[in-house]
């Protein structure tokens, strides 16, 4: 019996280990290793995910800017770029989106963001002394290489955190009222932007962390394509306050650039109304949509691809365009266009009449407001911005 006992004891220990029982007390002198005692266990506790797969809860709670910090409604938002010379007149504006903020390293989306001509931004923010209700946001991104870095940043947890912290630093340093994100577009856009199939989900991770970082006293807005594709709106709207719908660039000649309503003969894909409706169906309430108005048009020979509104007066007065500058009005689409003597569509654009219809649409549909791209494309008299303001506010000033 005594010679058999060690073997029996070892068998008992083996059975206990197999069954997952701790034998530190049951078998004197033997301790089952725990994870802390395992010298090969080098995993850290709660590592920060880097794949963007488990940062979103299944039932996220809405986290938005407090109402008192959103600014005046209806909104009239001007995009104002670093290429501008004259400062904007804030009298008919409620918000200004200063463009552009860009990634420090656009190839990788790393290093946070930077601003070209920060001294100009400071002058724009100083307009709040003249009009205290004015809100100034920093627009980050844009089309083409201006959007470089978004996809690479959004898929990496460390870069997301750095991006959000950099946004907060700029908000604090300059006294900004928020951030306008112009990622064109998650999962789409030029291939050189590094687009990725997970962009849509990763975008929500960016929004969530940005909200957590800047808090509920600052605005988060997004410049959306005329199409409601690319974004998971039901989740995104839990973190962003409103959407600037870019209801333009919807057609080149012989099609309208930004038709208010669908006109079968000369509307390419969709109208402004269809775009607003599509965003609503996708989960963006009408009272959180800001309708885009282009202060430019699209042309074909003899015109440039892009024609600013402040160039239109010269087009009508110059002999260079004689016989090719005949204004037509599309009574269905509610926009003008130019044709030649044979009736060929040469230039689609917006003018005072069409902008008035669009401002009235904002009021009729109870939208949050209107925005326009861009301030410097208006003429020196402010013809378009004043027409937009008058259609929405009943006067050429937003002062109530």
Language-model features, listed with the residues they occupy:
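Active-site and adjacent substrate-binding regions of carbohydrate-active enzymes
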Residues: 168, 172, 180-226, 349-400
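A cross-domain feature marking catalytic cores of carbohydrate-active enzymes
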Residues: 80, 100, 138-142, 183-185, ...
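Glycan-binding loop/region signatures in secreted carbohydrate-active enzymes
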Residues: 56, 60-64, 140, 288-361, ...
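Conserved, mostly hydrophobic/aromatic
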Residues: 96, 138, 181, 243, ...
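Substrate-binding surface in catalytic domains of secreted glycosidases
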Residues: 105-119, 165, 186-320
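Glycan-recognition patch characteristic of GH18 chitinases/ENGases
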Residues: 55-171
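Bacterial Sec-dependent N-terminal signal peptides
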Residues: 1-4, 16-70
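Surface-exposed amphipathic alpha-helices with a cationic face
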Residues: 66-70, 121-137, 141-142, 203-218, ...
């Amino acid at each position: 019996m005594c010679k058999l006992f060690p073997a029996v004891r070892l068998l008992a220990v083996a059975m206990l280990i197999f069954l997952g029982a701790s034998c530190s007390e049951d078998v004197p002198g033997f301790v089952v290793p725990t994870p802390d005692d395992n010298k090969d266990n080098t995993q850290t506790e709660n590592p920060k995910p880097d794949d963007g797969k488990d940062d979103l809860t299944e039932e996220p709670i809405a986290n938005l800017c407090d109402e008192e910090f959103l600014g005046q409604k209806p909104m009239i938002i001007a995009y104002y770029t670093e290429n501008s010379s004259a400062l904007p007149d804030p009298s008919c504006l409620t918000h200004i989106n200063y463009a552009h903020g860009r990634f420090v390293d656009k190839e990788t989306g790393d290093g946070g963001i930077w601003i070209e001509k920060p001294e100009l931004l400071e002058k724009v923010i100083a307009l709040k002394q003249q009009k205290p209700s004015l809100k100034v946001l920093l627009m980050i991104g844009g089309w083409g290489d201006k959007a470089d870095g978004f996809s690479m940043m959004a898929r990496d947890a460390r870069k997301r955190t750095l991006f959000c912290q950099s946004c907060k630093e700029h908000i604090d340093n300059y006294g900004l009222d928020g951030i306008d994100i112009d990622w064109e577009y998650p999962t789409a856009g030029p291939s050189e932007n590094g687009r990725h199939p997970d962009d849509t989900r990763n975008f929500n991770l960016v929004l969530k962390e940005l909200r957590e970082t800047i808090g509920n006293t600052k605005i988060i807005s997004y410049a959306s394509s005329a199409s409601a594709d690319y974004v998971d709106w039901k989740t995104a709207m839990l973190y962003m306050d409103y959407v600037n719908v870019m209801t333009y660039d919807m057609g080149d000649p012989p099609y309208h650039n930004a038709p208010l309503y669908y006109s079968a003969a000369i509307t390419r894909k969709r109208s402004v109304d269809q775009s607003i409706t599509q965003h609503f169906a996708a989960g963006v309430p009408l009272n959180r949509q800001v309708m885009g108005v282009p202060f430019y048009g699209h042309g074909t020979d003899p015109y440039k691809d892009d024609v600013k509104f402040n160039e239109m007066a010269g087009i009508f007065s110059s002999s260079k365009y004689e016989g090719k500058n005949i204004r037509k009005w599309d009574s269905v689409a509610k926009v003008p266009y130019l044709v030649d003597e044979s009736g060929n569509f040469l230039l689609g654009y917006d003018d005072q009449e069409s902008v008035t219809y669009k401002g009235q649409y904002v009021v009729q549909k109870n939208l949050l407001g209107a925005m326009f791209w861009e301030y410097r494309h208006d003429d020196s008299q402010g013809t378009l911005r004043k027409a937009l303001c008058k259609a929405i506010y009943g006067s050429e000033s937003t002062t109530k």
